[in-house]
Swiss-Prot record:
Residues 375-390 have a biased composition (Polar residues). The gene is Mef2c. Residues 433-443 have a biased composition (Basic and acidic residues). The lineage of its organism: Eukaryota, Metazoa, Chordata, Craniata, Vertebrata. It comes from the Eukaryota. This is Myocyte-specific enhancer factor 2C.
Length: 473
C-alpha cells in the first residue's frame, strides 16, 4: 500500500499549519545533514516562517558558508518554487500532489487520530471512575456507652464511638433516651481503633450528688464509679473489631446482680458500690477474642415502684476471657447460688433495713474479694476503704429466717484463700433468666444491703435484743 498523498496547497488551519511546519522543517534539516555527510558538502538553510521568525541550519558554520556565498561569482544553479513545479510536471508528476513522507503531519486532525484519541480518553475516564468507586470511605461504627444512675436527677452519659473517633470523652444525653438501651442479653462493644486510652474518672462519676440522704460527705467519694485516671490510661493493643451483637444462643448465661429498688430522691447507697464491685460479666464464648476496648455501662432502677427483676442491673465491664470460667467453675457456681453468692435481688425487706450493721471485717473482706478481681481483670482499682464509711455493728440474723451462727464466719474464711477466678465466682451473682426468680425465694444473704429505716435507728435496744438472741452460742 502506497503512501498517502496530500495536496500541496496552503494549509488553512493555523494549528495544523504550525504542526506541519515544525515537522517538515526538522525533516528538511535532517535531509540537509544526510546530504552534507554523504556527499561531503556544505549546506546552509535560512527559513523565515509566516510570523517572520528566523530558523537557520548550517552543516559547519553559518558565517563561513554565507561568506563563501557572497564571494562566489561563478555561474550556479538557482531554483524557485515555479522551477520545482515545472520540473515535476516534466517528469510526469502532478505538482499539486506529492507523496508525503511525513503522512502523520496533521495527525491531530485526521479521523483516524480523532478516533484513537477518543478511545484513549474513554479509557482514562473509566479508570478514574473505578478509582472513585474503590475509594469509598469505611463505614463508621457507633456504639453507645450509657451510665444512668438510680437517682432521678442523675446524668446519663453516652459515647458514640466511631472507627476513627476518640473514645476518651463521654458526651451527655437525656436519661429517658437511654432507658431501654441496656438489654441484659446483648453485649455492646465498640470496635477497636488501635491504641485507645482509658476513660477518665471525672467523666464516669455521678454528677448529680447531694450529701443529704446517703450519709456521705462527698458524693464523688461515695457510690459513683470512682476510677483513677492512672489505672485507666493503659494502652490496649486491639486487633480486630469484635462482633457487635452477641445473642443469648451463642454464649453462656452472664453473671448478673439484681439491685433492690432505689430511693427517689437519694443517691445510690452502698448497694451500688457492691454492685459495681461484684457485677463482672464473663463471656465464655469469646475465649478466642483478643482484649478489646471496654464498655463500662451502669443502669440501675430509677423508680421506687419497680419490682426486683423489672430492671436488672446492666453494669458490665466487658473484656477478653483472661480469667474465664471453665465448666468446672461454672458448675461450682450453683453451690454459691444458695450458700455464699450475694444475690442482691433476693434480699428481704428486713435485711435491706440493716445496711449499716455490716461489721468492718465483713466489709473489708467483701471489698478485698471484689477489688482483687477488678485489679487483675480490668484495672478498675476501686479501693476497699470506700466501704468502711459505714456504722460498724455486728450483723443481725434475719427475723423470720433461721441462720446458723457459724455460717457467715465460715463464708469469710472460705473466701480468704481463694484464687481470683474462685473469688469471682463467689462474689458474683447467679445466672440471668429464670434463676433470678428461683433464688429470690431460696436464698437470702446474711448481709443487709440498704441502710436501716428510721424506726430501726430509733430503737437500738430492740436490735441489741435480737443480736443477743441470734448469736448466743
Amino acid at each position: 500500500m502506497g503512501r498517502k498523498k496530500i495536496q500541496i496547497t496552503r494549509i488553512m488551519d493555523e494549528r495544523n499549519r504550525q504542526v506541519t511546519f515544525t515537522k517538515r522543517k526538522f525533516g528538511l534539516m535532517k535531509k540537509a545533514y544526510e546530504l552534507s555527510v554523504l556527499c561531503d558538502c556544505e549546506i546552509a538553510l535560512i527559513i523565515f516562517n509566516s510570523t517572520n521568525k528566523l530558523f537557520q541550519y548550517a552543516s559547519t558554520d553559518m558565517d563561513k558558508v554565507l561568506l563563501k556565498y557572497t564571494e562566489y561569482n561563478e555561474p550556479h544553479e538557482s531554483r524557485t518554487n515555479s522551477d520545482i513545479v515545472e520540473t515535476l510536471r516534466k517528469k510526469g508528476l502532478n505538482g499539486c500532489d506529492s507523496p508525503d513522507p511525513d503522512a502523520d503531519d496533521s495527525v491531530g486532525h485526521s479521523p483516524e487520530s480523532e478516533d484513537k484519541y477518543r478511545k484513549i480518553n474513554e479509557d482514562i475516564d473509566l479508570m478514574i471512575s473505578r478509582q472513585r468507586l474503590c475509594a469509598v470511605p469505611p463505614p463508621n461504627f457507633e456504639m453507645p456507652v450509657t451510665i444512668p444512675v438510680s437517682s432521678h436527677n442523675s446524668l446519663v452519659y453516652s459515647n458514640p464511638v466511631s472507627s476513627l473517633g476518640n473514645p476518651n470523652l463521654l458526651p451527655l444525653a437525656h436519661p429517658s433516651l437511654q432507658r431501654n438501651s441496656m438489654s441484659p442479653g446483648v453485649t455492646h462493644r465498640p470496635p477497636s481503633a488501635g491504641n485507645t486510652g482509658g476513660l477518665m474518672g471525672g467523666d464516669l462519676t455521678s454528677g448529680a450528688g447531694t450529701s443529704a440522704g446517703n450519709g456521705y460527705g462527698n458524693p464523688r467519694n461515695s457510690p459513683g464509679l470512682l476510677v483513677s485516671p492512672g489505672n485507666l490510661n493503659k494502652n490496649i493493643q486491639a486487633k480486630s473489631p469484635p462482633p457487635m451483637n452477641l445473642g443469648m444462643n451463642n454464649r453462656k448465661p452472664d453473671l448478673r446482680v439484681l439491685i433492690p429498688p432505689g430511693s427517689k430522691n437519694t443517691m445510690p447507697s452502698v448497694s451500688e458500690d457492691v454492685d459495681l464491685l461484684l457485677n463482672q460479666r464473663i463471656n465464655n464464648s469469646q475465649s478466642a477474642q483478643s482484649l478489646a476496648t471496654p464498655v463500662v455501662s451502669v443502669a440501675t432502677p430509677t423508680l421506687p415502684g419497680q419490682g426486683m427483676g423489672g430492671y436488672p442491673s446492666a453494669i458490665s465491664t466487658t473484656y477478653g476471657t483472661e480469667y474465664s470460667l471453665s465448666s468446672a467453675d461454672l458448675s461450682s457456681l450453683s453451690g454459691f447460688n444458695t450458700a455464699s453468692a450475694l444475690h442482691l435481688g433476693s434480699v428481704t425487706g428486713w435485711q435491706q433495713q440493716h445496711l449499716h450493721n455490716m461489721p468492718p471485717s465483713a466489709l473489708s473482706q467483701l471489698g478485698a474479694c471484689t477489688s482483687t478481681h477488678l485489679s487483675q481483670s480490668s484495672n478498675l482499682s476501686l479501693p476497699s476503704t470506700q466501704s468502711l464509711n459505714i456504722k460498724s455493728e455486728p450483723v443481725s440474723p434475719p427475723r423470720d429466717r433461721t441462720t446458723t451462727p457459724s455460717r457467715y464466719p465460715q463464708h469469710t474464711r472460705h473466701e480468704a484463700g481463694r484464687s481470683p477466678v474462685d473469688s469471682l465466682s463467689s462474689c458474683s451473682s447467679s445466672y440471668d433468666g429464670s434463676d433470678r426468680e428461683d433464688h429470690r425465694n431460696e436464698f437470702h444473704s446474711p448481709i443487709g444491703l440498704t441502710r436501716p429505716s428510721p424506726d430501726e435507728r430509733e430503737s437500738p435496744s430492740v436490735k441489741r435484743m435480737r443480736l443477743s438472741e441470734g448469736w448466743a452460742t
